[in-house]
């Protein structure tokens, strides 16, 4: 039996609209992470308070954290077509993650880095998103 595949033809988006889309997604993700009533699991948004009760060097915990975060973000952000979550730093008082994002209607990957800092998440890359 021959398998047929359907390909959706997506309209092209101009560079300016792509830049606005990227900034909007990053801004919305940062808001989601810093929301006191976020729909994300507490370990994913609470950062350090929850992270300190675990062994941050535990590779199984790191893998679980990345899988859970990826699943939650894909559920809550419909503009993301593909996502890879990496821990850049995972120490007792430092938690830094990198999100490698592919958006629908965008051919270039988007890297969004987040760091837990003084009780909240901040991004060093939001200003550089284009």
Curated annotation (Swiss-Prot):
Function: Inhibits RpoS proteolysis by regulating RssB activity, thereby increasing the stability of the sigma stress factor RpoS during oxidative stress. Its effect on RpoS stability is due to its interaction with RssB, which probably blocks the interaction of RssB with RpoS, and the consequent delivery of the RssB-RpoS complex to the ClpXP protein degradation pathway.
Signal sequence region: none
Subunit text: Interacts with RssB.
Organism: Escherichia coli O7:K1 (strain IAI39 / ExPEC)
Any one biological process term the GO annotation gives: cellular response to oxidative stress
Keywords: Cytoplasm, Stress response
Matches recorded under SUPFAM superfamilies: gpW/gp25-like (SSF160719)
Native organism taxonomy: Bacteria, Pseudomonadati, Pseudomonadota, Gammaproteobacteria, Enterobacterales
HAMAP family: IraD
InterPro entries: Anti-adapt_IraD (IPR023776), IraD/Gp25-like (IPR007048)
Similarity field: Belongs to the GpW/Gp25 family. IraD subfamily.
Any GO MF annotation of the entry: anti-sigma factor antagonist activity
The protein's name: Anti-adapter protein IraD
Entry's Gene Ontology cellular component terms: cytoplasm
Compartments in which it is found: Cytoplasm
């Amino acid at each position: 039996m021959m398998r047929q595949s359907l390909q959706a033809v997506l309209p092209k988006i101009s560079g300016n609209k792509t830049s606005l889309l990227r900034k909007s997604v990053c801004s919305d993700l940062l808001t989601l992470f810093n929301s006191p009533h976020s729909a994300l699991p507490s370990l994913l948004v609470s950062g350090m308070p929850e992270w300190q009760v675990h062994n941050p060097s535990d590779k199984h915990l790191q893998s679980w954290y990345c899988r859970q975060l990826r699943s939650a973000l894909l559920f809550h952000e419909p503009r993301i077509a593909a996502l890879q979550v990496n821990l850049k730093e995972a120490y007792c008082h430092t938690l830094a993650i990198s999100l490698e994002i592919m958006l629908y209607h965008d051919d270039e990957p988007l890297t969004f880095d987040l760091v837990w800092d003084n009780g909240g998440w901040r991004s060093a890359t939001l200003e550089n998103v284009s």
